[in-house]
Amino acid sequence: MTVKSQNRQTKKLAGERIAILFTQAKVFAGINPAWSDRCVERARAIAMRQRMRMEREQRRQYCHHCYAYFLHGVNVRVRVHRGHVIVTCLNCGRQTRYQVVRTDNR
């Protein structure tokens, strides 16, 4: 097996593992939030080790300051203001802003 194919295979495996960790974080969120936060930390570590980006949906499911898994209505507040979505982590108070992109589906 060549180095290039090994690299592709490990990145694919890492992506699958990250997806599994985020599903586990969702399950653990109601049971023990510390476990779900740990799953997020492990997923980030895998992504950094493999030098790959997480998907947009995965990146928006946790706080980038305290790495807490977001449970809407419990530890996160979401507001829409002037074309931006403002996500506030209620654990650390950090605000993250995402631009709202309007699609042309009129």
From Swiss-Prot:
Its cofactor is Zn(2+). Keywords: Cytoplasm, Endonuclease, Hydrolase, Metal-binding, Nuclease, tRNA processing, Zinc. This is Ribonuclease P protein component 4. The keyword Protein biosynthesis does not apply. It is an enzyme of class 3 (hydrolase). GO terms for biological process: tRNA 5'-leader removal. Its main location: cytoplasm. One of its GO terms (molecular function) is ribonuclease P activity. It is found in: Cytoplasm. It catalyses: Endonucleolytic cleavage of RNA, removing 5'-extranucleotides from tRNA precursor. Signal peptide: none annotated. Belongs to the eukaryotic/archaeal RNase P protein component 4 family. It comes from Methanosphaerula palustris (strain ATCC BAA-1556 / DSM 19958 / E1-9c). Zn(2+) binds at C63, C66, C89, C92. Binds 1 zinc ion per subunit.
